């Protein structure tokens, strides 16, 4: 080929001319070697990889050939390497091309067959037509080839659509025909790709919705259920498949707050509500999201199960760490408390802890909770002084909402599955005492402004510093509630009667302060002895306060007698004077009788506790009581 002209003088495109220049360096025009052909496993692998393109492309070629027959031509589908994957067309034409080596699996690269549209379309990325002596190889001068490249959704070359015919059969419409087929196949590939991507996203979304802890429901503008995940179906006791397409109001009785929000297309966030499904009430915390569109408003509803919301809240608010292991074991009075505390932990009955201010009733309550089978559940502490007014009833026992305010779980409901610690039970409002009695006796609670019963499973531990029996007689405390709480009563002796536990309490407090202040703390023996001998009218709380102040003010972390506050010596002197007067005015028998009477008053006349408190056997105690004419029954609390 001389210059850029055919033998007849027609000009050729730069694309073809450049191809000729490359081919001149690689091959001879006169020779023709049958092109390399992929066969067997290799061809099958290529075919599988292009399955999507072939499925669409073959259908398009069949449609095109049906329109073109009986024209002498052949239609090809090639991959991005110019390997023939599929052929269709006139049998005689296919046979002639096959004789040249153009079969399924044949590689039509430029380096093999020379300048030809089959390879140039892939190289240039555009539609190309070559005919007659535009081909580099003379064996192809009797043929015309048209080819248009195919691209995927990301713009990458994925194949070629080609047409081949004898040169005398070619027409001006051949190249546009391959272009039209290629565009059709490309559009179908794009549609399939987008559909596959959409399906993939839908599968991911469905997997996400099914793996959520929350239930998810959606319904259209007509109120017909469109989607419900397994969690929502389980919570609402619905058949997910059978419920599809049905009206949401046919499946459920919606709470008033939700009905109002739907009517106003108003969103809700973490609102407590109650559904009725299959004649059962179902509590849930809901979030509603309206989707406002031109054709109407559809909705997505999230169901946050109350049980999980309780667990979430109590995991942050309802954990305590004090156990019986933290209590000193050296003192017999403390060992007695641990013994009765463990009995209380094994029991399901309410527990009443009695004793002076500051004796550690709250810590004993925590130890009972952590020893019980409810240790993994919440521990909710309530100071009843705050609930002396019935106006706070809603916070204590809850109330059903009919507006758009966020619902809030009551203190009783928060304790579900765990322990409810009621500090200073004597201050609880009379109206709330009835609600508490209902929880203890029946295991249910009735909210304010509601008729339904809510199951509540709690262990009640109450404390008091008052004489509840006297309050009952004065009609200031519920008689029935007193009976319920009095079933398991533990009296905690004041610290002055548990002096043996003071060294352990002091050391435990010092170790705790060491961790807080990151320093070493120690106390001299004489200073500790002085602390043991003090009266401690404020009990454990006063002792801890003194130790903390001493730790902050001590020199180099050492607590000496000289560091002790003066009021401790004053209290000790007062106690010494009282003891001296007692010893001079009373005989030993009178002192013994007074000690037994004091023990009976503290323990309510319970022999076993009196025996432990006095440090003598029950037989000895019975003998001495008989000797002094003391009747334990007269000290029992009567209502």
UniProtKB/Swiss-Prot annotation:
Top-rank taxon: Bacteria
Signal sequence bounds: none
Keyword tags: Activator, ATP-binding, DNA-binding, Glycerol metabolism, Nucleotide-binding, Repressor, Transcription, Transcription regulation
Region of interest (Sensor domain), residue spans: 1-318
UniProt xrefs under Gene3D superfamilies: 1.10.8.60, 3.30.450.40, Homeodomain-like (1.10.10.60), P-loop containing nucleotide triphosphate hydrolases (3.40.50.300), PAS domain (3.30.450.20)
Ranges where the PAS domain occurs: 203-265
Binding residue positions for ATP: 355-362, 415-424
Bridged cysteine pairs (disulfide): none
Domain Sigma-54 factor interaction residue range list: 327-552
GO BP field: DNA-templated transcription; glycerol metabolic process; positive regulation of DNA-templated transcription; regulation of DNA-templated transcription
Up-regulation conditions: Represses its own expression. DhaL and DhaK act antagonistically as coactivator and corepressor of the transcription activator by mutually exclusive binding to the sensing domain of DhaR. In the presence of dihydroxyacetone, DhaK that binds dihydroxyacetone has less affinity for DhaR and is displaced by DhaL-ADP, which stimulates DhaR activity. In the absence of dihydroxyacetone, DhaL-ADP is converted by the PTS to DhaL-ATP, which does not bind to DhaR.
Residue span(s) of domain GAF: 52-189
Coiled coil: none
GO cellular component assignments: protein-DNA complex
Pfam family, one: HTH_8
Assembly and oligomerization: Homodimer. DhaR forms complexes with DhaK and DhaL-ADP.
PANTHER family in the record: PTS-DEPENDENT DIHYDROXYACETONE KINASE OPERON REGULATORY PROTEIN-RELATED (PTHR32071:SF117), TRANSCRIPTIONAL REGULATORY PROTEIN (PTHR32071)
Role played: Positively regulates the dhaKLM operon from a sigma-70 promoter. Represses its own expression.
Name of protein: PTS-dependent dihydroxyacetone kinase operon regulatory protein
Organism the protein comes from: Escherichia coli (strain K12)
Gene: dhaR
